[in-house]
Amino acid sequence: RREIIRILTDFSITVRPQVPAILQSYEFLAEIDFIRAKAQFAIQTNAIKPSLENKQVLDWRTAIHPLLQLSLAKHNKKVVPLDIELNYKQRILIISGPNAGGKSVCLKTVGLLQYMVQCGMPVPMHERSHIGIFSNIFIDIGDEQSIEDDLSTYSSHLTNMKIMMKSCN
């Protein structure tokens, strides 16, 4: 037991001066691991870095929800890609269709891919796609009914939308 304590003490004395370099190496390794993970993700999902615009625009071609793509690929199924174009002339998009027609998937795809781009992640869409950077991304997910405040699902969504509209650019 004394020998173990002596060995560990000697080891600690030897390593202690190297702690800053070890921590720096650890941070560098974490950064390399992150870059490698992004590259692997890009390969798995055929993701690219789209052309970034200095204006608020979405001009997406064959955009695909990456998590859905990976999930369906396990069953040899493919995701239906979507094209979206929003710009200063065409600022509103109405999405309609039957139940299970892809409306929610479309909205989730837009939100996720926009967020991914703004985090510096590659996204699965055609290389000729263009994407603007937005100062805010707002999301209203789920049912936020409040019995105490007497808010229905619909009025809760309206309250959230009001806050978003006041804060958006």
Task: Describe each region flagged by the PLM.
Residues 133-169:
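Switch/coupling sub-region of P-loop NTPases
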Residues 1-100, 105-109, 114-136, 159-160:
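Alpha-helical coupling/stalk and coiled-coil linker elements that connect catalytic or binding modules
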